[in-house]
């Protein structure tokens, strides 16, 4: 197998590592049965608090970044870098370790973007964060961040491979948040800081 194929597989496996599930398990909690059932940092925050949530967020961000670093070490093309970034996100969303279920891919998307294009990532982050702080809806901030990253990639004149990668990541974010969109419309979406009982 070529280096490109191996790197794509490694990126998927990196992304598949379910940090939220593993961290919650150390507290005797099955994260998939708590709150939203999501394996990401937001649900960890609801169930276990800020400390464990920050650990999960850090891991989910940097597993995407590690995938990009490995791809660069192999000297892969720009388009392959984009493919590796997407595979890491798909691994998080559809983890082989969780029977192809997983999270929403926001932190991992940010991590890949941070290592692909730090300037774009650091322009995008405060936009998404501002929406979260203003509304206390993490889902709204996540989707806004996805749109902002795509718009900024166009505005900043980024190359086609990067624009395409960011566009597909934004689409994935909206796809994984489709139930959140429904709850936002219905007014039943949980806000940041709302706790749930950890079982």
UniProtKB/Swiss-Prot annotation:
Claim: Transmembrane is one of the keywords in the record: yes
The alphabetical list of record keywords is:
Cell inner membrane, Cell membrane, Lipid biosynthesis, Lipid metabolism, Membrane, Phospholipid biosynthesis, Phospholipid metabolism, Transferase, Transmembrane, Transmembrane helix
* InterPro entries associated with the record: G3P_acylTferase_PlsY
Stated family:
Belongs to the PlsY family.
Q: Give the transmembrane region(s).
A: 3-23, 50-70, 78-98, 113-133, 154-174
Instruction: Give the highest taxon in the source lineage.
Output: Bacteria
Q: What is this protein called?
A: Glycerol-3-phosphate acyltransferase
Identify the GO cellular component terms for this protein: plasma membrane
State the annotated membrane topology for this chain: Multi-pass membrane protein
Q: How does it assemble?
A: Probably interacts with PlsX.
**Source species:** Thermus thermophilus (strain ATCC 27634 / DSM 579 / HB8)
Gene encoding the protein:
plsY
Catalytic reaction annotation: an acyl phosphate + sn-glycerol 3-phosphate = a 1-acyl-sn-glycero-3-phosphate + phosphate
Q: Which Pfam families match?
A: G3P_acyltransf
Pathway, per record = Lipid metabolism; phospholipid metabolism
